[in-house]
Amino acid sequence: MSDIKSLDDLKSVVGEAPVAEVAIAREPVRDSLGRSYATGKRKDAVARVWIKPGSGKVTVNGKPMDEYFARPVLQMILRQPFKVANVEGQFDVMATVAGGGLSGQAGAVKHGISKALQLYEPALRAALKAAGFLTRDSRVVERKKYGKAKARRSFQFSKR
């Protein structure tokens, strides 16, 4: 072993182990009705989402999307995963969402749709992951501290 002076010498003696770069082949996950199920979370909202092939109808808590999320911005948030994956109007979505406000609920449904899409069609995973839709947005409201008016705001200071 004393004849090994550099890293190249060591590699020639030991031999380089072949590095196996195997992409994991993911199988589509569907239930007996041909649907994919996923949960999405955002702030305090939790959404349970089922998707199946269809005409693009989105139902949230038993109501059409445009009735439950009246603001166009929230409707746009729900459509983002379909635009990124280039599958607009190909899936029906049935979601139940609870907790939080409307913005958090829209984010939770979007997260759930993204996760369900990649379970239904694993080939869409790369596009959804690149857009950041499969990552749980961990930002939540900061807690209020004692001795402060809010989380960070101090009480008014009076010099005299």
Curated annotation (Swiss-Prot):
One term of GO molecular function: structural constituent of ribosome
Record PROSITE patterns: RIBOSOMAL_S9
Disulfide bonds: none
Record keyword Ribonucleoprotein present: yes
Top-level lineage group: Bacteria
Keyword entries, A-Z: Ribonucleoprotein, Ribosomal protein
Organism: Cereibacter sphaeroides (strain ATCC 17023 / DSM 158 / JCM 6121 / CCUG 31486 / LMG 2827 / NBRC 12203 / NCIMB 8253 / ATH 2.4.1.)
Protein name: Small ribosomal subunit protein uS9
GO biological process terms, semicolon-separated: translation
Lineage of producing organism: Bacteria, Pseudomonadati, Pseudomonadota, Alphaproteobacteria, Rhodobacterales
GO CC annotation, single: cytosolic small ribosomal subunit
Family: Belongs to the universal ribosomal protein uS9 family.
Keyword field contains Ribonucleoprotein: yes
Encoding gene (name): rpsI
